[in-house]
Amino acid sequence: MVTTLPQAFYSNFLGNAPSWYKKAICLFLLINPVIFLISPYIAGWVLILEFIFTLAMALKCYPLQPGGLLAIEAVLIGMVSPHTVYEEVSGNLEVILLLVFMVAGIYFMKELLLHLFTKILLSIRSKAILSLLFSLVAAVLSAFLDALTVTAVIISVAVGFYSVYHKVASGKHFHHDHDHGDDESVHHDHRADLEQFRSFLRSLLMHAAVGTALGGVCTQVGEPQNLLIAQRLGWDFIEFFVRMAPISIPVLIAGLITCVILEKTRWFGYGDDIPASVRKILEDFNEAEKKKMTLQHESKLITQAIVALILVVALALHLAEVGLIGLTVIILATAFCGVIEEHQIGKAFEEALPFTSLLVVFFAVVGVIHEQHLFTGIINYVLGLEKSVQPGMFFIANGVLSMISDNVFVATVYIDEVRTAFNDGLIDRAHYEALAVAINTGTNLPSVATPNGQAAFLFLLTSAIAPLIRLSYGKMVWMALPYTLVMGGLGYVMIVITI
C-alpha cells in the first residue's frame, strides 16, 4: 500500500520489477561512481558485469531501462564520452537500419511464413528431423542473408504457432482477438500441453539460432564482422569461403550431428515433441485457412512470395545495405497487399524498436570497453606470444571476449591491431591471413555461449516470444552449452591442425 510520495516514486521506479531487483539497480548506480574514482579500469569491468546481469534478468525487467540508466551514468561520470557513443552507433548504422526496417519487413510477410512453416511442421513427424531441418535451413539462409533477418523469420513463425494454440486453449476460435501473453484464461486440461509446447518451441528456436552461427561463419556476408575482415584482407566471396572452409565445414557438420544427438538423448532441455492436442489444433487451423482462402488472400500470399524472392536475391547479391532492402520489402509488401493505414504499419515496428534502443545502450557499454581499454591487455598478451601458437590463442581470446562483448566489436578491435602489426612489418602476409581466419572463426563460433555474444541471440532473448515460451538468459546459456563445447572445441582443434 502506497501511503507517501517517496513510496509512490519507488513504486513507479522500474514498475512491477521485484523489489530486490530495484534495490540491486540502485546499488549499482551508487557504487559505480565510487569505483570509477578508485579505478576506471575496474569500474569498466564492473559495468560490463552489471549490464550482463540486466540481460540475465530480462524476464524480470526489460534490460533497456536498467541498462540504459547504467549507460547514462557511465556518460555522466566520464567513463565514456557522448561522442564515443555516437561513433559506436554511427559505425553500426547498418545493424540499426536492419533492425528497424528488416524486422518490420518480415512482419508484413508473416502470413506466407506461417502458411509455409505450418505445412512443414505438420508434414514432418520426427522431432529430430524437424530440428535438423530448422538448423540446416537457418545455417544455409544465414550464409547468404543475415543472422538477424533469419532469426526474425523464425521468431515470427514461432509467435504464430504459439498464438494459434494459446487462443484455442483459452476457449476461443481462430478469428477471435486474444492476448496470448495471459495464461489466466488457458483451460486447466491444456496447461500441461502448453508447457510441453513451450519446451518444443524453445528447442526449435535454439537449434535455429545456433544454425545461424553455423552458417554465418562460412561466408563474407554471413555476419557483419565477416564483411569487415574480408575488406581488410581483400578477399572476395569465393576466397573468403575457401579460407574459412577447413574450419567452418567440419564445425557445421559437427553442429548438425549435435542437433540430432541432443534431440535423441533429450539432454540440456531438448527432445520434447509437439503434443498431440497442439498438432490437432494446428491441423484444424490449417484446414480453416484453406477453407477461407479467397482469391484476394491467395493474391496476398503470391505477392509476399515474390517479395520474399526479391529479398533473397537482393541480400545474396548485396544490392544495397540490409536495412534499405528491408525498407524496400515494407514498401512492396504493404503497397501490393493493401496495407495503407498508419496504425497498421506502426504495429510492424513494435517488435524491433525496443531492441534497437537496447542495442544503442549496448553500444554505449562497448564505448566504455573502447575508452577504458579493457581488452588491450589481453590483445597485447596474445600478440606477444610465439607466432606458432598465436592462431589458436587468437581463437580462444576472441571467443572468450565475444561471450562478454559484441562479437563485431571484438573482431574489429583484433583485426585492426593485427593489420597495424602487418603494416608495421611485424608479421608477414601468410601469418596475417592465418590470424584473420582465427579472428573470424573465434568471434563467430564460441560466442553462441551467451546471448550477448551475438546480436541474433540477444534479439531472441529480448523478443516477444522469449517470455511466452519461458526462454530466459540462463536457459539460453544452458541450452547453448553443448553447442559451445562442440563448436568451440572443434573450431580450436581445426585452427591448430590446419593453420
UniProtKB/Swiss-Prot annotation:
It catalyses: 2 Na(+)(in) + 3 H(+)(out) = 2 Na(+)(out) + 3 H(+)(in). One of its GO terms (molecular function) is sodium:proton antiporter activity. The chain crosses the membrane at residues 33-53, 66-86, 89-109, 128-148, 237-257, 305-325, 326-346, 349-369, 393-413, 449-469, 477-497. It is found in: Cell inner membrane. InterPro entries: Na+/H+_antiporter_NhaB. Its main location: membrane. This is Na(+)/H(+) antiporter NhaB. It comes from Hahella chejuensis (strain KCTC 2396). The lineage of its organism: Bacteria, Pseudomonadati, Pseudomonadota, Gammaproteobacteria, Oceanospirillales. The gene is nhaB.
